[in-house]
């Protein structure tokens, strides 16, 4: 069961684009005074922003719009492309201030519109041939959206939808959407007691005890894997002076997203990124070429101001921990170090059952620093590192940062959604700005290349992804609540239940006994709702035969094993970081 990414399919993109126009046509019929802003295709389908005056859409209004859309689709009008002059366009849309604003932003010359029946809209296209092709659609939700995304502007109404070629494809996608709702990390995070967010600290997650267990496991695993690869770990200040951020360039380009404070008549800022701190560590001592590569890792907490309307659980926050590492390398070490990073990424993502794709972003057309020769060599090194790591990659021409090319790593979760988490960014800028040097073999001082890289990205966001990826049913090694031992009778079997629990805790497992005077079914259901990885039921048979009956979270079937067999099974699952179903 996977959600479809509309943008990955050219035909599906056209179909959804045309369906957005069909929706706008239906809205115009139902609300003749409607004014329209834009209606783009997005990965989840399409949306259209509209001004309906005093009309505030309700959930039931979407059904009315759908009914009108079905009439339009049944009529099957052709979708016709036309070219008109800018002057004619201004005349055609003179009653719609939002379209006038768009038109005034266009260069002089002809403008394309697309027409279907009585409805016409500004659009570059392309579109499908007829609206009849858009009959398999669903309007998904509606929300508010500021015009041009500016909170100082008027609030418009946004309606989302999606369209497919066939009814079966639509139904499958809607089923996947329902599954995604059940897996919503905000919902599961609350039910499982993992995290909360207080009105007193918006965008700043508070991790609860079980959430801290999960977080600590992820961070310990990160430290273990990086230690194997020769990383050294640092911790840099959370607040540093304005002068540092001016030196790094963040003050010029990122000031509006930074939290600042005056201390002893001197301006400071809470760090939005960890990079400058790593550069201070590098410059704290002299370096020879023999010291390189130098791999500095930091699980560093950063703060970035985000608009309140953009905040979303663990996915969009104002403070998070970035699993940064900054590698200082010589040019001839670059390819090998990137290859090692990719191998590390592969090892970590595979543990979570997360396939991924790599995208190489190359030199922008203008505004970049460094010579073309350096860029070409750097891009080649990144590409060759992918090849030598046995990884395919796609090229994203011109999308590199001004200071260097990069590899973006996009993971795919169990619902087919793509998340950009890992990055390997080559930086030719900051080492120059901070005057970082090393003494080369010939005795001359040279500037190292710096690699910024993350694997999890944001630890908090990665936790949110994992909650939804696993639907809360974490593999045993990762689960905050691994076992609950449930005696059939709260008194008769409690001694044996405690024996089983003690055997589990002796192996370092997290286990409790639920011996409350409640019905067995109630206690089992509660453990299922809490997504305890294994529920272990013990009664007369288990007590007499030294066995346990185990049921895995999210499963209906149970199995009975000897206690020794069960303990060996559980230990192997933790040691091997086994994924369920593997």
Question: Residue locations for each model-derived region?
Answer:
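NTP/phosphate- and nucleic-acid-binding module
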Residues: 1-37, 41-582
């Amino acid at each position: 069961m996977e959600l479809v990414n509309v943008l990955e399919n050219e035909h599906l993109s056209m179909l959804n684009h045309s369906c957005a126009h069909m929706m706008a046509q239906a809205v115009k019929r139902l609300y003749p005074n409607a004014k329209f802003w834009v209606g783009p295709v997005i990965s989840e389908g399409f949306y259209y922003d509209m001004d309906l005056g005093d009309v505030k859409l309700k959930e039931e209004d979407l059904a009315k719009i759908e009914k009108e859309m079905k009439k339009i689709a049944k009529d099957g009008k052709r979708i016709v492309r036309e070219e008109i002059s800018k002057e004619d366009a201004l005349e055609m849309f003179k009653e719609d201030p939002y379209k006038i604003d768009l038109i005034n932003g266009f260069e002089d010359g002809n403008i394309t519109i697309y027409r279907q029946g009585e409805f016409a809209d500004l659009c570059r296209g392309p579109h499908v041939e007829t609206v009849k092709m858009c009959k398999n659609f669903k309007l998904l939700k509606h929300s508010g959206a500021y015009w041009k995304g500016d909170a100082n502007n008027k609030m418009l109404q946004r309606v989302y939808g999606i369209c497919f070629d066939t009814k079966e494809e639509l139904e499958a996608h809607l089923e996947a959407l329902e599954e995604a709702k059940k897996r919503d990390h905000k919902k599961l995070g609350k039910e499982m007691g993992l995290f909360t967010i207080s009105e007193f600290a918006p965008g700043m997650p508070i991790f609860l005890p079980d959430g801290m267990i999960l977080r600590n496991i992820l961070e310990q695993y990160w430290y273990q894997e990086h230690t194997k690869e020769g990383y050294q770990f640092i911790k840099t200040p959370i607040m540093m002076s304005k002068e540092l951020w001016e030196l790094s360039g963040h003050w010029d380009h990122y000031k509006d997203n930074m939290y600042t404070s005056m201390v002893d008549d001197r301006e400071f800022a809470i760090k939005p990124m960890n990079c400058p701190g790593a550069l201070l560590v590098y410059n704290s001592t002299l370096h020879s070429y023999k010291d390189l590569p130098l791999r500095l890792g930091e699980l560093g907490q950063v703060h970035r101001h985000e608009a309140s309307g953009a905040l979303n659980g663990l996915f969009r926050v104002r403070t998070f921990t970035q699993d940064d590492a900054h590698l200082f390398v010589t040019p001839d070490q670059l390819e090998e170090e990137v290859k090692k990073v990719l191998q590390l990424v592969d090892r970590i993502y595979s543990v979570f059952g997360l396939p991924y794709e790599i995208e190489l972003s190359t030199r922008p057309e203008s505004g970049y620093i460094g010579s073309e020769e350096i860029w070409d060599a750097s891009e080649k090194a990144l590409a060759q590192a992918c090849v030598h790591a046995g990884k395919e990659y796609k090229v994203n021409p011109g999308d590199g940062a001004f200071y260097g090319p990069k590899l973006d790593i996009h993971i795919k979760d169990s619902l087919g959604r793509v998340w950009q988490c890992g990055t390997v960014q080559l930086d030719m800028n900051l080492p120059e700005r901070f005057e970082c040097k090393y003494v080369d073999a010939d005795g001359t001082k040279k500037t190292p290349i710096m690699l910024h890289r993350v694997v999890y990205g944001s630890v908090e966001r990665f936790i949110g992804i994992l909650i939804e990826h696993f639907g809360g049913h974490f593999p045993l090694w990762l689960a905050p609540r691994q076992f609950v031992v449930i005696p059939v009778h709260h008194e008769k079997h409690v001694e044996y239940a405690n024996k089983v629990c003690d055997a589990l805790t002796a192996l370092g497992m997290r286990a409790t006994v639920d011996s409350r005077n409640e019905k067995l079914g109630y206690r089992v259901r509660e453990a299922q709702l809490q997504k305890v990885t294994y529920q272990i039921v013990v009664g007369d048979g288990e007590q007499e035969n030294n066995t346990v009956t185990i049921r895995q979270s999210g499963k209906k079937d149970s199995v009975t094993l000897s206690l020794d067999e069960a303990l060996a099974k559980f230990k192997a699952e933790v040691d091997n970081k086994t994924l369920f179903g593997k």
